[in-house]
Amino acid sequence: MGSRWQMEKKHDPYYKKAKKEDYRSRASYKIKQLDKKFKLIKEGDTVVDLGAAPGGWSQVALEKVGEEGLVIGVDLNRIKPFPEENFHGIRGDFTTTEVQEKVMNLIGGKAKVVISDASPSLCGIKNIDQLRSIDLTNTVIGIADNILEPKGNLVMKVFQGPEYKDMLTRLKKKYRQVKTTKPPSSRKKSSEMYVVGLDFKPKKNKKSKD
């Protein structure tokens, strides 16, 4: 199984392209294609990358935001530092309050974009894997609710399951536009999809009456 996967990887055009163009992973082309289609990241933006290791998405985000922007990558695994000083890596579980507070402190305000190519730990049992995927998706949505500025953007990996449609319905109440897509660089065999939320509409705090 391992040798077959290695052979497929070597013949993968995006794997070869990433090696040639010095990207950390073939996943870099997913966010490049998503950004080209939806104009997610602009120069000067603050971007939070959830599940960032090895850093393929953060690498592209750094290119897009330029010197005036900021990219924060979070992952359980170590993210090898980038030469750019405007990248901050956090090693930890982004589903925990402690790590989320670290992100908030680094931002010092709100983020313009939340990106996530994170996948849950899969065990091969369909029902359990779907529940884990739903939990992870809900966590990413919740973090975006807390840290996105008005009109901010979200893009995240999802796997279709029983609660997929309900999740899209909820997102449509939070963002002016919600799109689903599968970029060309996603493997055809993969069941992954990407959900894009454009123009975040934060809940307005109700003023208490005197």
Curated annotation (Swiss-Prot):
- Which portions of the sequence form the region Disordered? 175-210
Q: What is its EC number?
A: 2.1.1.166
The record's subcellular location field reads: Cytoplasm
Catalytic activity, reaction form: uridine(2552) in 23S rRNA + S-adenosyl-L-methionine = 2'-O-methyluridine(2552) in 23S rRNA + S-adenosyl-L-homocysteine + H(+)
Q: What class of enzyme is it?
A: transferase
Q: Name one GO cellular component term.
A: cytoplasm
Q: Which GO terms describe its molecular function?
A: rRNA (uridine-2'-O-)-methyltransferase activity
Q: Which residues bind S-adenosyl-L-methionine?
A: 55, 57, 75, 93, 117
Assigned keywords, A-Z? Cytoplasm, Methyltransferase, rRNA processing, S-adenosyl-L-methionine, Transferase
Q: Does the keyword Methyltransferase apply?
A: yes
Q: Which InterPro entries match?
A: RNA_methyltr_RlmE, RNA_MeTrfase_FtsJ_dom, rRNA-MeTfrase_E, SAM-dependent_MTases_sf
UniProt key word Metal-binding: no
The protein's job, in short, is: Specifically methylates the uridine in position 2552 of 23S rRNA at the 2'-O position of the ribose in the fully assembled 50S ribosomal subunit.
Its name, as the record gives it, is: Ribosomal RNA large subunit methyltransferase E
Q: Which organism is it from?
A: Methanobrevibacter smithii (strain ATCC 35061 / DSM 861 / OCM 144 / PS)
Its taxonomic path starts at:
Archaea, Methanobacteriati, Methanobacteriota, Methanomada group, Methanobacteria
